[in-house]
Amino acid sequence: MSLKKVLMLSFAALAAGGSLSAQNLIVGADFTTRFDNREYANNDFNESQTLFSARFTPRIGVEWMEKNRLIFGVDLLQNFGQHNGAREPFLSDVKPLIYYQFNSKNVQANAGIFDRKELLGDYSRAFFSDSTAFYHNRLSGFLGHYKSTERENTYVEMAIDWEGMYSEQSREMFRIISAGRYTLERGFYFGYAFSMFHFAGSKLNENVTDNLLVNPYAGWGFNAFFDFDIKAGFLFACLLYTSDAADE
């Protein structure tokens, strides 16, 4: 069934169920642009280029019992300067947002395909570069976090992002990420960020790679005419590689 038919049936089901329980209609949209002029000699890590794009994301959904939401949206991306021919798509990329969200005073949980901005954690660019965060802006899986209402900026979260399905054409890929922070008195705090990227094989190549990153840190936020945040931490990285895992 096409995405268009799925969305039409979903909206019809929401409209039909409006009389069954108290519901609030949610309508919104986000618009972002990104300009990144990368002028340098090409190397093994990246290439010299200019990234210039715009993204528009309209959303619609329903809320019931003040804690439950079901959201449908479309992520529309256009790379400036990309000329689409007669047989090419109108936009550079079009992808869905479909997720359920539970939201209470302390706890939030998302399941489905949702925006990366739902994350609370402080993940350095060693985890996600700024371009990765923009162009890979959706998570497909689950997110859960707990946020303290008694201590400011105190939370813990975990998410699973499923990025690839096991098949002959693609590898099985998923990423488990987690972060936490605890704020002490007078602005002192400590926390961590964690990522495990599982890059498994396809049906034609059974090699498996696991990339682990752990970043514990501590810091001090204070005000002296301006807001300051002094932070120090460590980054631990571990790469695990298994060849022909299916035969072992």
Language-model-detected regions and their locations in the chain:
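Residues on the lipid-exposed face of transmembrane beta-strands in outer-membrane beta-barrel proteins
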Residues: 56-62, 98-102, 142-146, 178-182, ...
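Conserved small/polar residues in nucleotide/adenosyl-binding loops
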Residues: 241-248
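Residues that define the transmembrane beta-barrel architecture of outer-membrane proteins
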Residues: 48-56, 90-96, 136-142, 170-176, ...
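Repeated loop/turn-to-beta-strand initiation elements of outer-membrane beta-barrel proteins
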Residues: 25, 66-72, 106-110, 150-158, ...
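Surface-exposed strand-loop-strand hairpins of Gram-negative outer-membrane beta-barrel proteins
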Residues: 34-55, 83-86
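Surface-exposed coil loops of outer-membrane beta-barrel proteins
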Residues: 40, 108-181, 196-198
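Transmembrane beta-strand segments of Gram-negative outer membrane beta-barrel proteins
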Residues: 22-39, 70, 109, 232
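Transmembrane beta-strands of outer-membrane beta-barrel pores
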Residues: 31-39, 64, 74-80, 104, ...
